[in-house]
Amino acid sequence: MFGFIRPVKAELRVKEADRFQQVYCGLCHAIRAEYGRFYTLFLSYDMTFFALVAGSEEAETAPPCRKRCDASPFRRKSCAETDDALRLAADASILLTYHKFQDDLADEKGAKRAFAALLCRLGRRGYEKARARMPEADEDIRQALEDLRRLEAERCPSMDRAADTSSRMTAAVVPRTGDTRERILHQMFYQIGRWIYLVDAVQDIQKDMEENSYNPVVLRYELQTPDISAVREPLERTLERSLADICMAFDLLSPRRDADLIRNIIFLGMPTVTRQVLNGNYQTNEGRGKHGSL
């Protein structure tokens, strides 16, 4: 889960925008408290969303606290108090981030590979701690990445088979409670992983074609240029299918807190990103390049 999940700020009420920022900052502090500063460098809106959904069954929201941090050393910022949802999101964030390092190490060459190796060394201790807390999730993520590497080596043209690996990774970090909620969350985050993988593949078409890197969208539609206008409709349909399944799963959750904020992200934010990527005008964080600020 890296980079595409975010709310539409213009449609948020002030208290909802504040709440999103508080959870983002709260997750940063939860990661720092358990894993140190290193992994806070890879904090994302995606895992902030995961924390919101994971904690949505709670009836009450604890009052926010005010803390200083590396990004704001002189002024205390409002942030969410650490709770079970933020701890879970912190653990999940470390697992997914470290395995991303491992994936880069396997895929990249030259300086990029050396940098990935450095990140793996720096992140190893935190990863071992997170793996001890979520061993089943770690094994599922590892197996999914192995399957993805095999598909990449085969130059598999199936978008569904390739996206399934990402889906299994995001679903792996869902709490294993054995109840109906787990099944709903598993389906929800499976489809979120599918959507993320395919949106990322569309976004990377030009780069992957230039570098001759694996991209199932390019292979499936036998693209000769980065222009997707001829295949936009089927791409849009497959992305909308995942969005529809995500929306249906959310409707089954009956969240008790942060429902409107989560709904903004699912029903507005993700469709907006889909359109922007297909139109070729998607920009990270609305083009400001300042991560962590709505």
Give, region by region, the residue ranges found by the protein language model.
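Acidic catalytic motifs of isoprenoid enzymes
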Residues: M1-S166, T170-Q187, R194, L198-S242, ...
